[in-house]
Curated annotation (Swiss-Prot):
UniProt KW Transferase keyword: yes
EC class name: transferase
Family under the similarity heading: Belongs to the PNP/MTAP phosphorylase family. MTAP subfamily.
Name this polypeptide is given: S-methyl-5'-thioadenosine phosphorylase
GO molecular function, one term: S-methyl-5-thioadenosine phosphorylase activity
UniProt binding sites for phosphate: S14, R56, H57, S89, A90, T192
Organism: Gloeobacter violaceus (strain ATCC 29082 / PCC 7421)
Protein's pathway: Amino-acid biosynthesis; L-methionine biosynthesis via salvage pathway; S-methyl-5-thio-alpha-D-ribose 1-phosphate from S-methyl-5'-thioadenosine (phosphorylase route): step 1/1
Length: 299
């Protein structure tokens, strides 16, 4: 089956369930080798580019962080031909200067999740990708510069760099955990982006996180503990800013998409010899392995 193609993908998190600026849209239902993604993907035109949008938790926010079909979500983007993927995500701040309604483009992750699927490989094919720089530097820089060039509503500030600690959830942090993460030098905290970043790297998709700060987690002595009401309220206030930034990022990618090492992440990562890989595994990973002829499934 052939699918409409899109070079740019956007994953929307809590509070960002649609992209109103997309024109000429089509909705595509997927059934990937890893099951269906969180929801149908909406593909449309924005600033001269075809863009694929996926609401991470599904429309209606139906999926817990640990229930997200991370593999299917990224594989669906790969099937559409996505090369650049921007992920919008609600986060708590672990630093005084990262205020609620600020936006952060982090450059590192720290994993505190438990047994979530975070690789496409196995089943007779071993691969080890480089992940020392989990965020694609070129895309994150482009996105941050685009954000700084946008007229933002309110007092939103743009920050670059920092570490996103990915917690299991769905409960928010204890005070002890929040204080510990701060003592470790972590900057923001969320529940979803680490697995996306790993899988995007394996799929050779350039990936960056746009983290929307909603709260101070629970460490701040002058702010109450985080609540869903607080998160959603700040996300709604910042939704228009997020939409404006996404448009600006797409415009810049349309004008001059940067080269990215992620686009060849598998070049030296595949360890198993092609003749030793089961045909079923080659077929399952066909979209990811397509540019490596020796690993393509037999017709």
């Amino acid at each position: 089956m052939s699918y409409p193609q899109a070079r740019i993908g956007v994953i929307g998190g809590s509070g960002l369930y649609q992209m109103a600026d997309l024109a000429d849209t089509v909705e595509v239902q997927f059934n990937t080798p890893f099951g269906p993604p969180s929801d149908a993907l909406v593909i449309g035109t924005l600033a001269g580019e075809r863009v694929a949008f996926l609401p991470r938790h599904g429309r209606g926010h139906r999926l817990l962080p640990a229930e997200l079909p991370f593999q299917a979500n990224i594989y669906a983007m790969k099937m559409l031909g996505v090369e650049y993927l921007l992920s919008a995500s609600a986060v708590g701040s672990l630093r005084e200067e990262y205020r609620p309604r600020d936006i952060v483009f982090p450059d590192q992750f720290f994993d505190r999740t438990k047994d979530r699927p975070s690789t496409f490989f196995g089943g007779g094919l071993v691969a080890h990708i480089g992940f020392d720089q989990p965020i694609c530097t070129e895309l994150a820089h482009l996105a941050a510069e685009a954000a700084r060039g946008v007229e933002l509503i309110g007092e939103t500030r743009i920050h670059t760099g920092g570490t996103y600690v990915c917690m299991e959830g769905p409960a928010f942090s204890t005070l002890a955990e929040s204080r510990l993460y701060r003592s470790w030098g972590m900057d923001i905290i969320g529940m979803t982006n680490l697995q996306e970043a790993k899988l995007a790297r394996e799929a050779e998709i350039c990936y960056a996180t746009m983290a929307l700060v909603t709260d101070y987690d629970c460490w701040h002595p002058d702010h109450g503990a985080v609540t869903v009401e607080l998160i959603i309220d700040n996300l709604h206030k910042n939704a228009e800013n997020a939409q404006r930034i996404v448009r600006a990022v797409v415009e810049r990618l349309h004008a001059a998409a940067p080269p990215c090492a992620s686009h060849s992440a598998l070049k030296y990562a595949l360890l198993t010899q092609p003749e030793d890989v089961p045909q079923a595994t080659k077929q399952k990973l066909a979209a990811i392995l397509a540019k490596y002829p020796a690993y393509r499934p037999e017709v």
